[in-house]
Amino acid sequence: MIAPSVYNPTEERLLNRAKKYQADENINIYGFKHSGEYKGIVVFKTENKTAEILDIAVNPEYQGKGIGSRLIDYIFSQFAVNKITSETDDDAFGFYKKYGFTVIDTKLNRDIKRYVCECIKKVNNT
């Protein structure tokens, strides 16, 4: 499920990433399951009231149906964080922008433009 969010997702790279995630107690993995199938997944690390999205992926058949947004909503609602950060490329930038993330930096990685984004938790004052 996570392969679409990984650059050059070889079996070895995916296995190494899974081992890295299992070894870090600050990393959380949550999936969105519907009708017995996982439709989306988010991997994130929490530290000092901030969550960093390491991977987020939604089954292509279910993209555009709000699953990615619900995964981010879950992080804000279930963890004591007031900010979420993520690094992404052109493929997912529109998703983050639509959710409300803003670009705080850009960089090149393997000649691919990367966007460092953040989203501050919205406070309801009504």
What are these regions (language model features)?
Residues 1-16, 33:
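Short amphipathic alpha-helix that is part of the acyltransferase structural core
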Residues 41-43, 70-74, 98:
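Hydrophobic, well-ordered beta-alpha structural blocks that scaffold small-molecule cofactor pockets
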Residues 58, 64-77:
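Conserved acetyl-CoA-binding loop-helix of GNAT-fold acetyltransferases
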Residues 20-26:
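Short loop/turn motifs at secondary-structure junctions and domain boundaries
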Residues 90-113:
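Conserved active-site alpha-helix within GNAT-family acetyltransferase domains
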Residues 31, 37-45, 50-57:
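Conserved beta-strand in the GNAT
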Residues 77-91:
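Conserved GNAT acetyl-CoA-binding A-motif
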